[in-house]
């Protein structure tokens, strides 16, 4: 059965809006795990707009399932990861002005730098995933640089405006899953997935873990984090 990694970045976003200490992402992570999450995902951005270094260190000490650190492939972030030792690092592109990650890594353009980051992290005992668009060239490049996993960027599917566009994106995702598996890559997926569209992606099969944040935290505001996580776990489990 596919697993659920809950991204708690937006718990930190709410905290940072007032510059205080609440809500606490560490407490949110514990509640998510108790509700059935198989892992906790955070993105330590270079501008520290939500998750802070202290959060990462505390989460490493408290997370009982799996800690997945999303990060840019920079020397600073690699050094932090090697110090803290999350279970997995997912390398993502980063732009200072974006509200959220807007697309996948262009692994083909930056193969040398990404390959070096992948090697350093793996030598430190950390599994590595690359966040890529469902593009066969990017999947192949991810394999060439030695990544353990890819996380397929599902944003274009989530943003599709009509049935035809949605089906086209599902086909792209399905093809990326098959190619990645053929190349020996583990397959994760995320971005824009919610309670309405998750089953369509889950029906494709072949995905080991979904990393979902915004929709779960949004629902948690209305029904509580425990129920929000349990509802998503059920959707994935019974897809």
Curated annotation (Swiss-Prot):
Active site: 43 (proton acceptor), 70 (proton acceptor), 191 (proton donor)
Binding site for 1-deoxy-D-xylulose 5-phosphate: 9-10, 45, 50, 100
Coiled-coil intervals, chain numbering: none
EC number: 2.6.99.2
GO cellular component: cytosol
Domain of life: Bacteria
Subunit structure and binding partners: Homooctamer; tetramer of dimers.
Protein name: Pyridoxine 5'-phosphate synthase
Species per Swiss-Prot/TrEMBL record: Geobacter metallireducens (strain ATCC 53774 / DSM 7210 / GS-15)
């Amino acid at each position: 059965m596919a697993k659920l990694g809950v991204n708690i970045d937006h718990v930190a976003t709410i905290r940072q809006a007032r510059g205080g200490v609440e809500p606490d992402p560490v407490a949110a992570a514990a509640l998510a795990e108790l509700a059935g999450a198989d892992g906790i995902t955070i993105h330590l951005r270079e501008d520290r707009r939500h998750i802070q270094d202290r959060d990462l260190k505390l989460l490493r000490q408290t997370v009982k399932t799996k800690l997945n650190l999303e990060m840019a492939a920079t020397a600073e972030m690699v050094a932090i990861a090697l110090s803290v030792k999350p279970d997995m690092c997912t390398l993502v592109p980063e732009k200072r002005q974006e509200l959220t990650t807007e697309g996948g890594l262009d692994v083909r353009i930056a193969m040398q730098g990404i390959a070096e980051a992948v090697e350093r992290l793996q030598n430190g005992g950390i599994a590595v995933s690359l966040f890529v668009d469902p593009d066969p060239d990017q999947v192949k490049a991810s394999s060439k640089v030695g990544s353990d996993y890819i996380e397929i960027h599902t944003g274009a599917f989530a943003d599709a405006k009509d049935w035809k566009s949605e089906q086209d994106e599902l086909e792209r995702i399905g093809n990326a899953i098959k190619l990645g598996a053929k190349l020996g890559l583990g397959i994760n997926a995320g971005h824009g997935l919610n309670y309405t569209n998750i089953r369509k992606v889950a029906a494709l099969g072949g995905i080991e873990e979904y990393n979902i944040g915004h929709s779960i935290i949004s629902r948690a505001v209305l029904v509580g984090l425990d129920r929000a996580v349990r509802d998503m776990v059920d959707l994935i489990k019974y897809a």
